[in-house]
Structure formats: C-alpha cells, structure tokens
C-alpha cells in the first residue's frame, strides 16, 4: 500500500485529499480543495489562488489513476462540485473529468445530514449519476475489492458532539498487510469518532485536527483535542498525520508539541516544509504589495516554487 497526500493546509489550501495505491488499484479520498473566502476579513492572496490551481491540477492528475473515489461529506474542500467556483477551482467540465467512469463510495445524501449538505448532496448526485460507473452509499458498510477492503464508519459529528455542521463518515482501507483510516473532518474532538479509530487500531491515521483558530465560536477544542488525540496515541499503534483545520492556526506547532507524540502534517510526510498560507494571509497581502514582512521559511520556499511554475 502506498499513501500519497495530495493537498492540505500545510500545502497551502483547504483540503484533506489523499491517494492510496493498492496493487494496481487506486483510491482517491475526498477529492476537493478550496480557499476560505474571508480570513482576517481579507479575501485570498494571489499566492493562495496559485496554490489552489496547483492543488486542482494534482487532484485531477490522481483522479486519472483512481478506480474508486470516496467522499466523506459534502463540503467543497472534500468534494469537487459541478459549478464554476473561483475559490473551489471547480467547473462542470472539471467535475465531469474527475468523476467519469469511477466507482463512487459516498456519504449518504439524506440520512444523518444537515440541510446545507443535503442540498449539496442532491446537486452532486443530480450531476454525477449519469457519468459514474457505480454509486454506493458508504455509511457503516464494507466493500470487498479482493486484494483490499474499504470499510466506512457510522456517521460521526463534524467536530464536537451536536455540531451544526452535520456528520461525516471515516474510511478504513485494509490490504491485509497495512491499514489506514482517513478520519476527515471529525477534528478528533468527539468521543464517537475516537472510539471507532481506537477499536480499528490502524497503522496510519490521517485526520483534520481541532479548529483551534475558531475557539471564539466552538469553545475550548484545544484541551478536548489534546485529551482525545493522546488517547489515540496511547491506545493504538497508529502513526499520525494531522493537518487541515489545526494548520489554519499559527500556533499549530505549539499544539503538536503538547501531544504525547508529535504527528506529521501532509507536507512533513512528503519531506517538505510547511506552507500554511491561510494562517499568514495578512502577511501575504503585505508581501504581495512589496512590503517587507517576516514569513516562515516553508512559505518563502513554497512561494518561490509557485513562481517557478508560472
């Protein structure tokens, strides 16, 4: 089994897209990427837009290698919609190319879902039903592909218990030699999700971390997240990759270092330096105006790479 992180906050965009290769088969998990329309009351910087285009090209590239696509929920940073979206780098043509001929294993569109995601799921299915090879609802089900199995968790909260953001499904891929769980936007701050992860005891856990940049809205997720992630560290043998919401906070390193075992980000797993562009949106706008600002070296390096690709 080969695991390739594609896009995430440590790589400059909102995403948790991953490609898994098992033998000759490819599985693409949560193929979406987006930018926060507003952060610090600012629209995305030009460098964020460039990073989104890079993420989009990678998602499309890996989609060509995928037989199966899984979707944990219907937020646009986790699936690609069929509309022209500047902050999603989406269009009907892009979405059609992505999903055509694929086996889609997706979150149930009408059960354990909030109103917003139900509308999005309806629009998604309306467009994808004529082009996908097969569509199955994954919630609590296991799919046997011969040399590997894909198992879905029951629906769990998107964040804390009672979250207004609805529910997500986690996905476990097991080839008999190695297993990986993609825990999506559970944020590792609800008991139900963490209990399922511990029960399955994967070799690798990929998850979005607590949204510590939103404590003014969601409460003290820092302490809850630390407690529950430490439980996973101490009660499983899993290697941890944690990214997404937590890396929107400039203090993500401090949070990581407070855990019993420091996880990796997508960038670090790939041997790269972190480039959390959204967290530094203020500074990026100043930098793009030609002002002298201090940026993390990982961002400076990433910006140089983006410039070289133009």
Curated annotation (Swiss-Prot):
SUPFAM superfamilies: Metallo-hydrolase/oxidoreductase. Signal peptide: none annotated. It comes from the Archaea. InterPro entries: Metallo-B-lactamas, RibonucZ/Hydroxyglut_hydro, UPF0173_UPF0282_UlaG_hydrolase, UPF0282_hydrls. PANTHER family: UPF0173 METAL-DEPENDENT HYDROLASE MJ1163-RELATED (PTHR43546), UPF0282 PROTEIN MJ1629 (PTHR43546:SF4). Belongs to the UPF0282 family. This is UPF0282 protein PF0593. It comes from Pyrococcus furiosus (strain ATCC 43587 / DSM 3638 / JCM 8422 / Vc1).
């Amino acid at each position: 089994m080969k695991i390739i992180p594609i896009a995430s906050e440590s790589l400059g965009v909102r995403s948790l897209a991953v490609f898994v290769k098992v033998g000759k088969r490819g599985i693409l998990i949560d193929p979406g990427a987006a930018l926060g329309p507003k952060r610090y009351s600012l629209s995305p910087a030009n460098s964020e837009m460039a990073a989104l285009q890079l993420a989009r090209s990678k998602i499309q590239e890996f989609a060509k290698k995928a037989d199966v696509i899984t979707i944990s929920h219907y937020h646009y940073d986790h699936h690609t919609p069929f509309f022209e979206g500047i902050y999603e780098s989406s269009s009907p043509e892009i979405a059609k190319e992505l999903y055509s001929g694929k086996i889609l294993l997706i979150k149930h569109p009408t059960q354990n879902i909030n109103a917003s995601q139900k509308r999005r799921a309806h629009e998604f299915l309306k467009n994808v039903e004529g082009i996908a090879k097969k569509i199955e609802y994954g919630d609590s089900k296991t799919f046997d592909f011969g040399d590997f199995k894909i198992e879905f968790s029951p629906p769990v909260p998107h964040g804390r218990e009672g979250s207004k953001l609805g529910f997500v499904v986690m996905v476990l891929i097991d080839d008999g030699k190695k297993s990986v769980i993609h825990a999506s936007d559970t944020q590792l701050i609800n008991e139900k999700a963490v209990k399922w992860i511990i029960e399955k005891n994967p070799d690798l856990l990929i998850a979005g971390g607590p949204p510590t940049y939103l404590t003014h809205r969601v409460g003290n997720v820092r302490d809850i997240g630390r407690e529950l992630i430490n439980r996973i560290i101490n009660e499983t043998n899993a290697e941890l990759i944690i990214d997404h919401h937590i890396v929107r906070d400039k203090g993500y390193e401090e949070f990581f270092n407070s855990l019993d075992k420091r996880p990796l980000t997508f960038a670090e797993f790939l041997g790269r330096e972190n480039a959390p562009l959204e967290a530094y949106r203020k500074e990026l706008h100043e930098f793009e105006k030609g002002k002298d600002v201090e940026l993390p070296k990982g961002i400076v390096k990433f910006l140089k790479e983006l410039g070289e690709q133009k």
